[in-house]
Amino acid sequence: MLFMVKFRWETEFKETDIGKIPKDWDVKKIKDIGEVAGGSTPSTKIKEYWGGDIPWITPKDLANYEYIYISRGERNITEKAVKECSLRIFPKGTILLTSRAPIGYVAIAKNPLTTNQGFRNIIPKDGVVSEYLYYLFKTKTMSEYLKDISGGSTFPELKGSTLKEVEIPYPSPEEQQKIATVLSYFDDLIENKKKQNEILEKIALELFKNWFIDFEPFKNEEFVYNDELDKEIPKGWEVKRLGDILKVESGSNAPQREIYFENAKIPFVRVKHLVKGVCIESSDFINELALKDYKMKLYNEKSIIFQKSGESLKEARVNIVPFKFTAVNHLAVIDSSMLNEKHYFIYCLLRFLLKEIVYSVKGTTLPYLKISDIENKYIIIPPQPILQKFHSLVQPLFEKIINNQKQIMVLKKIRDALLPKLVFGELRVEEL
């Protein structure tokens, strides 16, 4: 489908209160294209309100959420809660827009659901394409504008009355659908590759658990008790400190001055770039001067990275970085050059091990792990033939994950370049 799309650059614009738009487009207020309504929170003291079948969405459910549609959040409510608390069930296709810090997270209701009071939801009128509105709100221009018009200095909030008066560029429903179709093509590809990666990751981690935690393939072998691990392990397997077989390094202080970000092309990974899956998806960028002045190390592609300090430490995220990079000092790195056939064994090991380690973190204001806390942890080392066999089984899975991730990054770059040009009419979709 993508290769059959025909675009053209728009050449005829008209001046409006929101700037230049194509001469055949309109400007409409949100209140003219849909109903704006909020949600609420049932009393948490009444157990009968919670654990039902009705999805209840909060802004937290949209944090780091990259899909267009959402069907449910962390919690559900009951019919009793809806009736007694005057909650509204929003229909499929409703635009869910967060109105409190953070302002501007957006998704589309995949099915009927409810939200808390941290949303200003838009129920589009007939003929209005939900996906077009979704992509419009995803632009940096709209996101920043919504924050600018939100009242409150300490706790900014986008009021419903304010949102209703927001003016937006409004193409015909047919063109709205064309724009949404082109952009959702990229998002569909991205979602499919993400789902592939989730399945591949699950297979690899299950295999690791089966072999090196449950020891299922080795049940018939002789087992011996190991003091360091406080459990029985197959005879002939070694137990070593993690620091005895590899080096864990800390990232560098983050540059602050603008001079270090001019003509920046070197990926700089921060805590915010860590993800729940295998691969880092994005980064900030610094330049060669920052690399030199801060004595930063440039790590190799496919190195392993994880958090060692910060508020989100207990999420215990461990990632592989599919490109060369440097990292902030809140992160720890194991360079891929020292991993060889242990690469994916160590990655899987850390996925399980880090969860245990973070429960003993120090620091009340800012939880942190020392590098020594990690390097002094005892781990099991299987015989080389077993390690090589495991590597041969999971390497194709991880290589596919990494290749998928590289494709996702390219797809996102193309989508993000097209997004503002399409929704603001600079680029027109002629044919699909």
Curated annotation (Swiss-Prot):
CDD domains: RMtype1_S_EcoJA69PI-TRD1-CR1_like. One of its GO terms (molecular function) is DNA binding. Keywords: DNA-binding, Plasmid, Restriction system. One of its GO terms (biological process) is DNA restriction-modification system. Pfam families: Methylase_S. Type I restriction and modification enzymes are complex, multifunctional systems which require ATP, S-adenosyl methionine and Mg(2+) as cofactors and, in addition to their endonucleolytic and methylase activities, are potent DNA-dependent ATPases. Contains two DNA recognition domains, each specifying recognition of one of the two defined components of the target sequence. PANTHER family: TYPE I RESTRICTION ENZYME MJAVIII SPECIFICITY SUBUNIT, TYPE-1 RESTRICTION ENZYME ECOKI SPECIFICITY PROTEIN. The type I restriction/modification system is composed of three polypeptides R, M and S. Belongs to the type-I restriction system S methylase family. The specificity (S) subunit of a type I restriction enzyme; this subunit dictates DNA sequence specificity. In the presence of the R subunit the complex can also act as an endonuclease, binding to the same target sequence but cutting the DNA some distance from this site. Whether the DNA is cut or modified depends on the methylation state of the target sequence. When the target site is unmodified, the DNA is cut. This is Type I restriction enzyme MjaIX specificity subunit. It comes from Methanocaldococcus jannaschii (strain ATCC 43067 / DSM 2661 / JAL-1 / JCM 10045 / NBRC 100440). The gene is hsdS.
